[in-house]
Amino acid sequence: MIWLGLSIAIFLGALYFSPPQIFTKPPLSLLALAAIIFLAIAWNVSPTLPGQAPGKFYGLIFHFYGASLLTAMFGPAIALAILFPVAFLGVYVIQGGYAEASQHYLMVCVLPTFFSYLTIKAIHRFIPKHLFVLILGNGYVAAFVSVILTGTLLLILKLLFGDASNHIDFEGWLLGLI
């Protein structure tokens, strides 16, 4: 229940800090709705390479990149507001359970959004303003850094608080992030 409360609090805070035009003006509202539907579908696709065992979270990188891309496009508040229905549509409706959807939102939506926003702010502060820097820095570098930092943090949390009987494939985990 604490997961759900924290998720709802973050979502309501994101809605409060989001400009209302994103959800009321027709071109932007359609883009937000399309992002919600597309990400909810894309997050339920789990691509695997030949020879990979299914269920190893190799498709999890789409979740991280989706959150990072929304942060670069709209900013963190709008990204978190869009990702909340995505997490609950994509996880709760398909797999069921408020706890799973809330944990998914917090770990796979909020963390990459946070790291991506911090990376974008650092790029804006320390690197000169240029179109190439905008595209490469905000798009690729922020996404890459947020994926690596989020994946590493989740791996550390899994090692600290996870079940000790489960074997963790470190190479598979880190290669799955890249």
Where are these regions (language model features)?
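Hydrophobic transmembrane alpha-helices
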Residues: 1-70
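Interfacial aromatic-anchored transmembrane helix boundaries in multi-pass membrane proteins
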Residues: 47-55, 87-116
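Small-residue-rich segments of transmembrane alpha-helices in multi-pass membrane proteins
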Residues: 32-41, 68-73, 109-114, 138-151
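Cytoplasmic-side transmembrane-helix entry/capping segments in multi-pass membrane proteins
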Residues: 24-35, 59, 66, 79-85, ...
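Hydrophobic cores of alpha-helical transmembrane segments in multi-pass inner/ER membrane proteins
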Residues: 5-12, 68-77, 110-120, 178
